[in-house]
Regions:
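Conserved core segment of the aminotransferase class I/II
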Residues: 1-69, 79-81, 164
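Generic structural signal for small/hydrophobic residues in well-ordered secondary structure
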Residues: 15, 51, 71, 99-101, ...
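Conserved glycine-rich beta-strand-loop-beta hairpin in the small C-terminal domain of fold type I
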Residues: 48, 52, 68-82, 90-104, ...
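Surface-exposed helix-capping loop/turn segments at secondary-structure junctions
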Residues: 82-91, 168-174
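Short amphipathic alpha-helical segments
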Residues: 12-13, 95-97, 140-143
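PLP-dependent enzyme catalytic core of the Aspartate aminotransferase-like
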Residues: 109-111, 115, 119-128, 134-183
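Residue-level recognition of strand-loop junctions within catalytic nucleotide-signaling folds
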Residues: 20-21, 56, 102-104, 147-149
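Short, solvent-exposed loop/turn elements at beta->coil junctions and helix N-caps
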Residues: 2-4, 87-88, 131-134
């Protein structure tokens, strides 16, 4: 297990493992893990302290993940707002902490999704991750987390919508100009 998902500490890269049963049966395995952690990994000391605090303190995760909890409300809001943007389709996740919207390639003819995401960041100050960053084969998806509070999500998705509107208009003009030139 780890802190990233259960305790909302993305980036901490701190986790733990429990081995149960007869220790003699797994002694070589444990020795191998210890050797690997000594050779290739470096202990995340602040993260180790965070584990102790997370496991021993108030377990707010139960309130957060309740059927009507904050994460469900934020997921529903992000899903609703993203679905309202023209040319964007999205599946509502049942267990993930993010959406993976698809952009209609006819409305958003993206050639380089890294540049597309960089432009969004530069123009609207919203950071997303391009779909190809998750081995998606086409430049028509991006990932957006719905962990921020509702007000922050509303503002971020409003900015995404503005960026996408400008992108659609810019590329619609190019298509219109090309059609006029052919006539």
């Amino acid at each position: 297990n780890g802190l990233s998902k259960n305790y909302r500490s993305c980036g901490y890269r701190s986790g733990w493992m429990v081995v149960s049963g007869d220790k003699a049966m797994v002694a070589d395995y444990i020795e191998g893990l210890n050797m690997l952690s000594s050779m290739r990994l470096c202990a995340n000391v602040p993260g180790q302290y965070a584990i102790q605090t997370a496991l021993g303190g108030y377990q707010s995760i139960n309130d957060l993940v309740a059927k009507d909890g904050r994460l469900a409300r934020q997921r529903d809001l992000a899903y609703k707002l993203m679905s309202e943007i023209p040319g964007v389709t999205v599946t509502k996740p049942k267990a993930a902490l993010y959406l993976f919207p698809k952009l209609d390639p006819d409305m958003y003819p993206i050639k380089d999704d890294q540049q597309f995401i960089a432009d969004l960041l530069k123009e609207e100050k919203v950071l997303l991750v391009q779909g190809t960053g998750f081995n998606w084969p086409h430049p028509d998806h991006f990932r957006i987390t719905f962990l921020p509070h509702e007000d922050t999500l509303r503002e971020a998705i409003k900015r995404i919508a503005h960026f996408l509107e400008r992108y659609r208009n810019k590329h619609a003009l190019k298509k219109g100009a090309a059609a006029t030139a052919k006539a």
